[in-house]
Structure formats: C-alpha cells, structure tokens
A protein has these predicted regions:
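A general secondary-structure signal for short beta-strands and their flanking turns/coil
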Residues: 10, 117, 126, 216, ...
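Conserved, well-folded catalytic cores of nucleic-acid-processing
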Residues: 33, 52-56, 71, 86-93, ...
C-alpha cells in the first residue's frame, strides 16, 4: 500500500481536440497500457473513457473525449454534447494540436470552449512526423494562436505519444494543476471502464480497421457470451456487430 504525502493531489484532466489529433494514443501512453482504442478514422472514440494514473504524490484521471467537430449527423451532435458536459467538471484541460497539420477554424472553435478554464495546457502532438525546424515554427504558431483567441495557456509542450517522447514531462506539468486531494480511485486500477466494455471496444477497433469499406463507422458491438476456457488463461468470446 502506498502512503500518500500531505500534499497529495488528485483530479480530472480532459484531453480535447479535433478528431484524429492523437488524443487516444496520448491517453494510452500516459496510463502506460492500452485502455482506449485508436484508429486513423475520425470519431473512433464514442464515450469519454477515463484512464487512471496513480503516483506516490498524485492521482490523475485523464478523460479521453470524442473529437470536437462541426456535426453533420445526430451522432456527431451527441459526441460534442458529451465533451461539453465533461469540460464542466474537470480540474484542467489539455488541448491537442498536431504538429503535422495546419491550425484551423475547428481548433479556434475548440479553444473558445475553454476560455473560462483557469488551467489549460496545449500538447503539440505527433512531433515524430515533422522535422525540427518545422516543429519550432509550429510552437511559435501555437503560441500566437492561443493569444489571438484570448486563451490563457500555462504550458505548450511538444510530444510524441507514439514514441513516448516528453510524455513524462507533460504528465508532471498536468499534475501540478491538480487540487490537493486524496486518491479518488483504488491505486491498482488504470481505468474505471468495465472489462466487458473494454472487450467490446477492442472488437470495434478491429472491425473499423479491417472492415471500414464494408461496414458503417457507427457500428455497435455487444457481447453475447464470455466464458473462461477450462485449464487456460483466456476466454472464449462470442459477440455481435450491429450495423
């Protein structure tokens, strides 16, 4: 059992950004294991998923949110509503801006959603995909962008979640923004997501990646049966894909 320090901190951090800017990959890197599915296809994340990071002096609950975008469908509208609801109850916000894409109207819209947040950081993601001089120019551009929309930013951190480059630094900077509090979850868990939900998400990830041309992106997976195989350390799972 870990003894918590007097100044132990705990709280929630929302990770937001446009679709496909590396939010889910970053959550997995921060937590240290895969709890969120990832895909090159937009809006793979449907529900806010909480990753729990427990350290001797803090516990951080990172909330992976669906990508914020101009909705064209009812699903898109509902995903945006989920993000707005989560922003109201977090202690800090991390905006993800990819190093290999231009800053656009979507990023401006997202930034304006958190103008009233006192603790905002920006992660310039996917730094492994650009050259050093391009990254330096992007960091300057991001700073100017934040100032232009009136966003007060505590830190701008370039990271590569894929290579886990500067993710430890980002984690420590986010931890500084948390309030003093005892841990909110048991220290031995890394997500509050039920095992069955994790399994359905992994199946959905495989379906999206392998059947993207054949099935709609709005597929839903349900578990029909899950039984532990006798004498083995794995389960037999029967699931249904609803399209």
């Amino acid at each position: 059992m870990t003894v918590e320090s007097v100044e132990h901190k705990a709280g929630f951090v929302a990770i937001i950004g446009r679709p496909n800017v590396g939010k889910s990959t970053l959550v997995n890197a921060l937590v240290g294991r895969k709890i969120v599915i990832t895909s090159k296809h937009p809006n793979t994340t449907r529900n806010p998923i909480r990753g729990i990071i427990s350290k001797p002096d803090f516990q951080m609950i990172v909330v992976d949110t669906p990508g914020i975008h101009k909705p064209k469908t009812l699903l898109g509208s509902r995903l945006n509503s989920m993000v707005s609801e989560n922003l109201e109850s977090v202690d800090a916000v991390l905006i993800c801006l990819p190093a290999d894409e231009e800053i656009g109207f979507g990023d401006e819209y997202i930034a304006k959603q958190v103008l009233n947040q006192r603790r905002v950081l920006i992660a310039v993601t996917k730094t492994d995909s650009v050259k050093q001089e391009t990254l330096l120019a992007k960091l300057i551009e991001v700073g100017e962008f934040a100032a232009s929309v009136g966003l007060s930013v505590a830190e701008i951190v370039p990271i590569s979640a894929k290579n886990e480059d500067q993710t430890d630094l980002l984690l420590s900077l986010l931890a500084e923004k948390l309030p003093i509090s005892p841990s909110l979850y048991p220290e031995d868990i890394t997500t509050d997501q039920a095992s069955e939900m994790t399994i359905t998400e992994l199946i959905r990830e495989a379906a999206i990646e392998n059947l993207y041309e054949e099935v709609p992106h709005s597929i839903v997976v349900t578990i029909d049966e899950m039984t532990k195989r006798e004498g083995k350390d794995f389960f037999d799972i029967h699931a249904t894909l609803h399209v």
